[in-house]
Amino acid sequence: MSSTKNKGSDAEQQATIFLQQQQLTLLEKNYRCRFGEIDLIMQDGDTVVFVEVRMRVNQLFGGAAASITPAKQLKLTRAARHYLARCDEDFPCRFDAILISGNREIEWIQNAFDEG
């Protein structure tokens, strides 16, 4: 496994632990479909939360938040629709971002974007 994949895996694990400490429940990790991949799918009460995890060592090029481009948001929303279509019920959902800095500080942005 490459160093980048290891860092990504570590960041996702850190994000999972953080969100579980906030009382969210892990439903799925690294959900893949033809539309893309969702890092974490969590449940917060009756809401399904699709989480994009980003880690940036430095703030060049705008930091972690800037890396969630409109194109990436579109892929995430399409993958989320695919996931929800498999469910028997119509759950409310939201898109969150977990941003992890080089010093491992976590920023949790709830409702980071909408389905637009």
Curated annotation (Swiss-Prot):
Signal peptide: none
Family matches, as InterPro entries: Restrct_endonuc-II-like, tRNA_endonuc-like_dom_sf, UPF0102_YraN-like
SUPFAM superfamilies with a match to the protein in the record: Restriction endonuclease-like (SSF52980)
Gene Ontology molecular functions: nucleic acid binding
Family recorded in the similarity comment: Belongs to the UPF0102 family.
Name of the protein: UPF0102 protein Neut_1662
